[in-house]
C-alpha cells in the first residue's frame, strides 16, 4: 500500500520561482509517496512564441524548478512527477521530470502536442516511458495532458509494467480528460493520478485558455478515489493498493494483457 497525491495549482505566467514556491507549499499540506504536479507548472501555459518558450525553459542540470523539487523530495522522502518546460540542445520540450528522493530518474517529453503547443515546442521522439521507484516498489508511467486522447499510450505503459499512470495536465476541454482517464485506468487495470491546473491565461488578441481543474485519482475499478473542485488550489492524497493494479484479469478467463490480439491492431 502506498499513497498518491495530486497538486492542483494556479501558476502565474512567467513567474517561475514564485510558481514553484507556491506549488511546493501546496504539496506540503499532505503526506504522500508520489506527488503529481500539473503540466508546465513552473512557467504557465500560453507562450506567445517559440523564442519566449525557450527563454523560460530550463535544463535539468541547472534548473531552478528541478533543484527546488529535489529539495522537496529529499525532505519528504518521496517522488515527484512534475510538468515543466525543458530546454536541451537548443530546443524546448513540454516535459515531465521524475525525481525520487533527490535523484532525477529521467524525463518524459510529451508525444502528442496540443493545438498551439506545436508552435512552441519541438516534437518528441522519447516514446512512452515507465520509471521504477525503488523506495516504494512501484512502477509508474507518465502521460502529459492531451496524451489521454490516445489509448495506445496508456496501453503501452501498462504493457511495460506501469501500475500508476501519472498525468500532469493543463486540461481545457471541460470534463473530457478526466472522464477519459477513468476509462484508461479501467481498461488497463491501473491507478491514474491527474493533476490539473486552474485559472485562465489570455496573452493574445484571440486566444484565451481556461483550465478546468477537477484533478483526480482513480482506481483500476473505474472509481474516483479523491477529486478537487474546478476552482481552488489544493493537494489531496489517498492510499493506493498496488495489488489491484497487478491483477490484470477482467474475468477468471481473461487477462487484459495476454488476451491482446496485437497482430491485428
State where each predicted segment sits.
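CN hydrolase (nitrilase-like) catalytic-core segments centered on the catalytic cysteine
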Residues: 64-79, 149-234
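Short polar catalytic/cofactor-binding loops
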Residues: 8-14
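Residue-level detector of high-confidence beta-strand sites
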Residues: 95, 107-109, 167, 227-229, ...
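Cys-nucleophile CN-hydrolase/nitrilase-fold catalytic domain and related Cys-dependent amidase chemistry
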Residues: 24-101, 105, 171-188
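Extreme N-terminal starter segment of soluble prokaryotic enzymes
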Residues: 1-6
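Short beta-strand scaffold segments in enzyme catalytic cores
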Residues: 82-84, 95-98, 129, 194, ...
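Active-site catalytic loop in hydrolytic enzyme cores
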Residues: 58, 87-160, 176-179, 183, ...
